[in-house]
């Protein structure tokens, strides 16, 4: 049996889980999320826990078991605590600002790069750090990756947009002397 899939998912107080025919709805203090139901799995809510079991033992079912359990656990954690990613802007003259639902990145181009935030995502800029937060883990990660792609960190000076905990592999510059 899947080591991840067989673990029950605890439901924190203030979070409500409803299992429908084709989606599982999760509501909590931070918002509401839905995740699709897999037809080869059985979902059950018992005494403050969600248990997912397999209906058969095919390879496809075993693969879906751990995946669907993790997706549902992320929904439950998202509506109770939320998720956030922190980006750091490194470089002389590089700036970041949040204006409503638009993030303004000035990262060495001749024009500022404006990125619209999708619904359910908020951003906060403090100095050279940008924190992206929301209830949907996948969407938070996607928006953070989209912003990082604007100016990836380069290996010589480390300039660019990087994740807060990311280590940039640095390269040595040219070492040849004049002739």
From Swiss-Prot:
UniProt region (Disordered), positions on chain: 151-179
Read off the Gene3D superfamilies from this record. Ribosomal protein L6, alpha-beta domain (3.90.930.12)
Q: Which domain of life is it from?
A: Bacteria
Q: Which InterPro entries match?
A: Ribosomal_uL6-like, Ribosomal_uL6-like_a/b-dom_sf, Ribosomal_uL6_a/b-dom, Ribosomal_uL6_bac-type, Ribosomal_uL6_CS
Q: Which UniProt keywords apply?
A: Ribonucleoprotein, Ribosomal protein, RNA-binding, rRNA-binding
Q: Give start-end positions of Basic residues composition bias.
A: 170-179
Q: Does the keyword Ribosomal protein apply?
A: yes
**Record-annotated disulphide pairs:** none
For molecular function, the Gene Ontology terms on record are:
rRNA binding; structural constituent of ribosome
Basic and acidic residues bias located where? 152-169
- Asked whether the keyword rRNA-binding is assigned, the reply is yes
Its GO CC terms are: cytosolic large ribosomal subunit
Q: How does it assemble?
A: Part of the 50S ribosomal subunit.
Query: NCBIfam families, per this entry?
Result: L6_bact
Q: What does this protein do?
A: This protein binds to the 23S rRNA, and is important in its secondary structure. It is located near the subunit interface in the base of the L7/L12 stalk, and near the tRNA binding site of the peptidyltransferase center.
Q: Which family does it belong to?
A: Belongs to the universal ribosomal protein uL6 family.
Protein name from the UniProt record: Large ribosomal subunit protein uL6
Species of origin reads: Nitratidesulfovibrio vulgaris (strain ATCC 29579 / DSM 644 / CCUG 34227 / NCIMB 8303 / VKM B-1760 / Hildenborough)
């Amino acid at each position: 049996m899947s080591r991840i899939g067989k673990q029950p998912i605890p439901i924190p107080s203030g979070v409500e889980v409803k299992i429908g025919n084709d989606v599982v709805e999760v509501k909590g203090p931070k918002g509401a999320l839905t995740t699709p139901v897999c037809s080869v799995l059985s979902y059950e809510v018992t005494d403050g826990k969600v248990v997912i079991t397999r209906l058969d033992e095919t390879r496809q079912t075993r693969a879906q078991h751990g995946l669907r359990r993790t997706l549902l656990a992320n929904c439950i954690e998202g509506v109770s605590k939320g998720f956030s990613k922190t980006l750091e802007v490194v470089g002389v003259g590089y700036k970041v600002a949040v204006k409503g639902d638009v993030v303004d990145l000035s990262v060495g181009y001749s024009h500022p790069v404006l990125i619209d935030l999708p619904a359910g995502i908020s951003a906060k800029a403090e100095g050279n750090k940008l924190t992206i937060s929301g209830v949907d883990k996948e969407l938070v990660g996607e928006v953070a990756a989209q912003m990082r792609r604007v100016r990836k960190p380069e290996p010589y000076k480390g300039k660019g947009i990087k994740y807060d905990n990311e280590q940039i592999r640095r390269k040595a510059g040219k070492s040849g002397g004049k002739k």
